[in-house]
C-alpha cells in the first residue's frame, strides 16, 4: 500500500507531480524541493514519514498546517520526524501549526532533530497542543532562537524582550499536555531565548504545561534559555502520575538581554531565572510520580538554579535529588515565595547546591496576593540538606535563606522519618530592618518525628566559621510534638521557645537560645539527651538559654536518645561509671532567671543488650564518676548531670543472640554436606562393570534443612553445581578416577535475618577394587576429597528506633576434607535368618568408615555492629552400615535400566562440633560460638538408576536422603557418561 497522509478535507492527488511516494514499510524522505505546506484537518500516517533537509525560508508557510481551525495527526504506530531542516520565517508559521488546537498521538516515534526555527511560532504552534500515546517523543539538538526580520533597506536592530519571547519549541497560548508516552520523552540540547522548550504566550502567563501518565523515562538535558527559563518559561507547570525516572540535568538560563542588570528587583520579565523552570507568578507542582526525580548540574544566571516560581509544591513518592545546581542570585535549587515539600514513600536530598542566598532554597519576600511560607514535611521518608553552599562566600554553608522575617515556617517529620539540616537555615532580611510581627516557627504541628539541626559534617576549616553551624529564626519557636534535635556543635537562635508537648533533644556542643531582644523566654518540659554525641573525650556541655527566663519545670522528663541501642551499649565506657554534664541553663537575667525541677528519667531501666547498668539524672554533680574524657567533671550551677553506673564492678555484658553469628561455624557443616553430594555423584562408577576409559558430567544438588533448637540457630542450605569425572575401569574390576566440580548456593539462618552466599570448589580421587575372601567376592571402594569454599555473609539488624534495617557484611573461606573407605560383601547369606531374603532380593551388605571436617579462616565484619570471627574448626567420624539391593529391567521397547538401592544406619562415633570465637570489635568482648548440635544417629537411603542409551552412553540419576533428629538432607545428581 503506498505511503499516504489521509485528510478528510484535503486531497493529495493534486500534488502527485510534486511529491515522491513509497511503500508503507519503508521510510519516505521528502527532499528540500518538495512543495510545502501540507494542509489538512485529520491526517493519518500509513508509513514512516521523514522530513529531512527542508528549507522553508521567508516565503513558505508551515510544513504541516491545519486546513481549518484544528489539526490532528495520528501516527498509527509509525514515525514522524523532522531532521536537519529550517522552519519558516513567515508570521504565524511553524513546522506544525494550527490556529486553535493541535493533537499529535500514537506515534512509534515523534522526532525533531538538528532543526532551526526562524519564525515567531517556534516548531509546533497552536493555542492548545496535545501529545499523547506513542513510544518515543524526542526533541534533540534543535535551535529556536528568534528575532524579527528588518524591513527592506533597514539594518537589524538590537533584540528586545517582545522579540525574543517568540522563540520556543512550543508556541502555546492555552496549554501544552504530554501524556501516555510509553518509552521515552526527551528534550535534549535545545537552544532558545525564554524557555527553550516552552514559553507561555498568554498575556498573564495563564498557560499550562503538563506532563502526566507517562510510563517511560523523562529527560530534560542540556537545554539553554539565553534570556531566562532554561526549559520552561511562565505558566502553570504540572508533572503528575508519571512512572518512569525523571531527569533534569545540565540545563541553564542566562541573561543575554541584561534584564538582571537593568532591573535588580524582579520585573515583569525575569531574566536569567530558573535553570529548568521559570514561572515567577505561577505554581510548579510534582505529585503522584512513582519514579525517581533528579535535578542536577542546572544553572541560572539569576534566581533558582533549577526552579523559580511563586509556589513550588513537591510530593516525593520515590527518591528526589537536587544536587550541584547553581544560581548566581538566590536559591541554588529552588527560589519561590511559597515552598511546600513533603515525602510519601521516598526521600528528598538537597546536596551540593550553590547560590548567593540560600544554597538549596531561597524563600522570597511576600507580595500583596501571597504572604508566602515554608512548609517541609518528612511524612514517609527523610528530607536531608547537606553540603549546600553560598556561591559568593567560599566555605560558607547555607541550606535555606528566608528573606522576610514575617514568613511562617513549618518543619514537620512523622514516625521514624527525619528532617536533617547539616547546613544552617537563616531567616532575616539584612537590607531592611524587620517590621511588624516575625513569623512563627512550628516544629511538628502535623507529625511526631525528628527535626534535626547538626554540624556533624562540617570540615575542620568550616568549623572555624561559626556561621556554618548557626541557624536563626527571629520568630517564636513551638515544638508541638515529636522532637527538635540540636546536636554536635549546632546552634539555633529563635525568639521565644516553648516545648511543653514536644521534646527538645540536645547533643554535645549544642546551643538553643531565645534572643528576642530583652523579652526572650525559654520553657521546656521534655528534654532528650543525644547520648552518642557525648561519649567522646572532646564532648562539650549543651546550652539552653534565653535573654530573660529559662525554665525546665512542670514535671520535666528526660529521654535517653540513641540511634542504635545495641551499638550504644557496646561502648566500653559503660564498663565503669560515667557522668555526662548534659546541659547548662543560661539566662542574662541576674536573679530569678533560671527555674529547675527534679527530672524524671523515662527509660532509665529499659532492658537492653550490651553492658548492663542503670541511669540517673540530677542537677547536682554525682561523686566518684568521671566524665567521658576520664576526668572529674566540673561542678557547675544550673547544670543537669546524667550518670551511668554498671551493675557490677567488672561490667556485665549481655550478648544479643542474633549477633552470635552461628552461620560461620555452621558453614563447616554445609561444606561437609557439599562434599558428600560430590561423593554421591560418583555412585555410577562404583556400581559399573564396564571396562575402559569413562568420562562423565553431571549436575548436582544439595538441600539441607536444620531446625532450630531452643535459642540455638538452625539453617537452610541450598546448593547446586556440576561435576566432571574421568576414570579408568580395568578388566579386573578395579577403578581409579579423578573428579572436579563446583557448587554454588546460599545458607539462611532459621532464627535471624542473616544469609551466607557461598561457592565451593572440589577436587577428589576415588577408586574400587575386588578382593577374594574365602572364595567370596568383596568390593572395596574409597574416596578422598578436598573442598575450598568462599562465604559471604550478609546480616540485617532491625532497628526499632528508626524502623529500618542496619546491614553488615563478612567474608571468609573454609578448607574442608572428606574421606571414606567402604566394603560391600554378601555376608547376609552367611546368616541363616537373612539367607533366603538375601537370595530372593539380591541383597548384599556394606560397611563404611567416613571422616569429614575442616577449618574456617578468621574474618572481620564491616558495616553495622561489626564482629570479628577467629579461626574455627570442626570434624566428624561415622561408621555407616546397611544393605544393598540391585534390580535390572530389560524392556523390549525401552532401553535396559539398572536400579541400585542402599539403606542403612549411620552412627557418628566421634565429633568435634564446629566452633570458633566471636569478638565484638567495639569493646573486644569474646564469646565462643558453636555450630548446630547435630544428632549422632541417622538413617539414610541411597537410590541410583542407570539407563543405557544406545549410541549416547549412559544416563543416570542419584538420590540420597539422610534423616536425623532435627535435620534432613537431600542429595540429587543427574548425569551422562561415555565409554572410550
Swiss-Prot record:
It comes from the Bacteria. InterPro entries: Autotransporte_beta (IPR005546), Autotransporte_beta_dom_sf (IPR036709), Polymorphic_membr_middle (IPR011427), POMP_repeat (IPR003368). It is found in: Secreted, Cell wall; Cell outer membrane. One of its GO terms (cellular component) is extracellular region. SMART domains: Autotransporter. Residues 661-980 form the Autotransporter domain. It is a peripheral membrane protein. Keywords: Cell outer membrane, Cell wall, Membrane, Secreted, Signal, Transmembrane, Transmembrane beta strand. Residues 1-24 form the signal peptide. NCBIfam families: POMP_repeat (TIGR01376). This is Probable outer membrane protein PmpH. It comes from Chlamydia muridarum (strain MoPn / Nigg). The gene is pmpH.
